[in-house]
Amino acid sequence: MTKAIIRLENLEKTYRVGETEVHALRGVTYEVHEGEFVAIMGPSGSGKSTLMNIIGCLDRPTSGRYFLEGEEVSTFDRDKLAHIRNRKIGFVFQTFNLLSRTTALENVELPLLYSNVSSKVMTELAKKALASVGLGDRIHHKTNQLSGGEQQR
C-alpha cells in the first residue's frame, strides 16, 4: 500500500456564532494515499469547505491532528503554513478566482511571488505552466478574453 500523504485523526472544528457553538466537523478521521484522487461531497452545511480549509492550511482544527507527508501540520507556525500552501497544496476551485485586470501570465505568476525566485524564472515557469495546459498562445490575454474552460485551466 502507498503511504498516506494526508492523514486526519479525529478532527473537530467548532465555530462560535454569538452565543451559539456550531460544530462544523466532528471526529473526522481519514487518509489520502499517494496517487489517489478524492472527491469531497455532501449536502450544504456538512463541513466540506471547513475540511478543505483545514487541509489547505487556511484554517486550523479546534482539536485533532492533521499530518501532511508525515509531519503534524496542526502545530506549524504561519510561515511554515504559508510554505505548504505555496509548495505542497493546490486546489481547483469552482470559481476561477482570477484577477480580472491582469493577463493569464500575470495570474499564473502571482503565487510565484512568494517563492523567492527571480522575475525571469517566475515568467519562465508561468509560461511553461500555461503551455502545458494549451494556453501558450493566450498568455497576454486578459481573463475576460478567455473562455470559461480556458479560465479554469
Model-inferred region functions:
Residues 3-153:
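ABC family nucleotide-binding domain
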